[in-house]
């Protein structure tokens, strides 16, 4: 496909998306719910087709030499399809954000003012190897009254296509425009460049992928962007941490799934914790098969690898973690401010004052206490699913669910009211 063809294709998709968004903005909540539940049923009915398509993508990924972490992101099985189905149903059951009254008040002039949620319009989602993003993004945009243009990575091309077909089955059954959820039907990377320039047709871009993709989008987009560059998540074991809680959380935060943005990439151990309990957290990680890149006295623990300066502030997305000792919560905070990506940080402590200091003095999108960073997920936050984790400070922040995909407008009612 040459450049002219891609430009024309993307313009056509954009025009259709804008028309669908205009209709979707006032669709009844019951019809959107029906479409999502029908899409969930279609996903189950098409599960063999989806798995066959995923097999083709996995073969393609193996040929390209994808890392184990990327292959894990790409892989679908019956359990993961069930998870997608549950996510669709959960989004269907969420309150519809469109039209919700955020605030209302009366003015001395006699005006009654309401601020109500309204769709953004058209959302463009650019993602890499996770085919489940097709379902999550499609569902959340539909729930929030937005049309969406999906551009999945070349690795997940067939899987995303099969999932997209199920989403459109749901739209048809509910009598909603199938153009409300469109997928870019080409692997040509020129389509991404076109999306980033489509200011007339797309209201916001959400990139979902690695640092290279997100950095490219942020650098070149003319359309506003919701994004995070990396998930450099920290776990800090305070001197007042409960040992057994700390052991459970650290292992889970690193090893449950290493290829997700909520995986812990750096462990900070308070010197007081080390004095009480020794290097037990490091030993647990080593026994679990994690490569621990340790600094200072932690590098003396047998089996660790000496940390290099570049290991701090690095997203490994693998069975690797950086580790160092800190003198108190303030040094932990300083380290996170320097090396973190404003994604998710967790403090392990039984001391309320220390936890409050950690929460008040850090400004990451998600801050946790005595909980695994792997909970940094819209589904775990009760959103049903997420379109991504936003770490910026404008508009959406943290897990981006249906509510975060809305703006607002003011509805002002008078009674022949005029301004003096």
Curated annotation (Swiss-Prot):
Keywords assigned by UniProt, alphabetized: Amino-acid biosynthesis, Cytoplasm, NADP, Oxidoreductase, Proline biosynthesis
Bilayer-crossing regions: none
Keyword NADP: yes
Superkingdom, taxonomy of origin: Bacteria
InterPro entries: Ald_DH/histidinol_DH (IPR016161), Ald_DH_C (IPR016163), Ald_DH_N (IPR016162), Aldehyde_DH_dom (IPR015590), G-glutamylP_reductase_CS (IPR020593), Glu-5-SA_DH (IPR012134), GPR_dom (IPR000965)
One of the record's GO molecular function terms: glutamate-5-semialdehyde dehydrogenase activity
Localization: Cytoplasm
GO biological process: L-proline biosynthetic process
Statement: the UniProt record of this protein carries the keyword Lipid metabolism: no
Family the entry assigns: Belongs to the gamma-glutamyl phosphate reductase family.
Protein name as it appears in the record: Gamma-glutamyl phosphate reductase
Organism the protein comes from: Cereibacter sphaeroides (strain ATCC 17029 / ATH 2.4.9) (Rhodobacter sphaeroides)
